[in-house]
């Protein structure tokens, strides 16, 4: 059986927050604002995986109204979902993700992100692709107000 899922997430940039994208801390004057650590890439990936198994969305499992998830490490949330997915007999076919940000530039961190995501999903890094783009200064990401991410995942059983 093959299952496909897609995920999308966006978070606002804010001062006095640490910037974590793809499980990697990125030095920058702003970080992403959210109930958890606001890792926009891991949230999109988690949502894509949840979609692939037909189990709703990330908010169903980790609601932002639950204080148990306040400042939660998104890598731990992804690992929790992945444990359920593996228990159901699925494994990663491949994952393709895009980070959309004007600043900071993500390209220097993409390889580290790829390795961290592969580790979290018990996969080979060749099964994971992460890329970054801008919106040519258009929209909220172009105005440097936030960062968005898209992810598509293929699961095999």
Swiss-Prot record:
Protein origin, superkingdom: Bacteria
Reactions the enzyme catalyzes? 4-CDP-2-C-methyl-D-erythritol 2-phosphate = 2-C-methyl-D-erythritol 2,4-cyclic diphosphate + CMP
Gene (UniProt)? ispF
Q: How is the cofactor bound?
A: Binds 1 divalent metal cation per subunit.
**Which Gene3D superfamilies does this UniProt record tie to the protein?**
2-C-methyl-D-erythritol 2,4-cyclodiphosphate synthase
Keyword entries, A-Z: Isoprene biosynthesis, Lyase, Metal-binding
Q: What does this protein do?
A: Involved in the biosynthesis of isopentenyl diphosphate (IPP) and dimethylallyl diphosphate (DMAPP), two major building blocks of isoprenoid compounds. Catalyzes the conversion of 4-diphosphocytidyl-2-C-methyl-D-erythritol 2-phosphate (CDP-ME2P) to 2-C-methyl-D-erythritol 2,4-cyclodiphosphate (ME-CPP) with a corresponding release of cytidine 5-monophosphate (CMP).
Q: Which family does it belong to?
A: Belongs to the IspF family.
**GO biological process: one example:** isopentenyl diphosphate biosynthetic process, methylerythritol 4-phosphate pathway
Q: Which residues bind a divalent metal cation?
A: 9, 11, 43
EC top class named in words: lyase
Which residue positions does UniProt flag as site: Transition state stabilizer?
35, 134
- Pathway participation: Isoprenoid biosynthesis; isopentenyl diphosphate biosynthesis via DXP pathway; isopentenyl diphosphate from 1-deoxy-D-xylulose 5-phosphate: step 4/6
Query: Recorded E.C. number(s)?
Result: 4.6.1.12
Tell me which SUPFAM superfamilies the record gives.
IpsF-like
Q: Provide the assembly information.
A: Homotrimer.
User: What protein name is recorded for this chain?
Assistant: 2-C-methyl-D-erythritol 2,4-cyclodiphosphate synthase
Annotated residues that bind 4-CDP-2-C-methyl-D-erythritol 2-phosphate are located at: 9-11, 35-36, 57-59, 62-66, 101-107, 133-136, 140, 143
**Could you give a GO molecular-function term held by this entry?**
metal ion binding
Q: Which InterPro entries match?
A: MECDP_synthase, MECDP_synthase_CS, MECDP_synthase_sf
- Identify the cofactor(s): a divalent metal cation
């Amino acid at each position: 059986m093959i299952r496909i899922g897609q995920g999308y997430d966006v978070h606002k940039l804010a001062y006095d927050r640490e910037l974590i994208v793809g499980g990697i801390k990125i030095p920058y004057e702003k970080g992403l604002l959210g109930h958890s650590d606001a890792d926009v890439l891991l949230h999109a990936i988690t949502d894509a995986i949840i979609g692939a198994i037909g189990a709703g969305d990330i908010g169903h499992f980790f609601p932002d109204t639950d204080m148990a998830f306040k400042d939660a490490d998104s890598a731990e949330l992804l690992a929790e979902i992945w444990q359920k997915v593996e228990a159901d007999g699925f494994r990663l076919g491949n994952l393709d993700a895009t980070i959309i940000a004007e600043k900071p530039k993500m390209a220097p961190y993409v390889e580290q992100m790829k390795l961290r995501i592969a580790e979290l999903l018990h996969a080979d890094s060749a099964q994971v692709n992460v890329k970054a783009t801008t919106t040519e200064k258009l929209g909220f990401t172009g105005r440097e107000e936030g960062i968005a991410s898209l992810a598509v995942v293929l699961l095999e059983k």
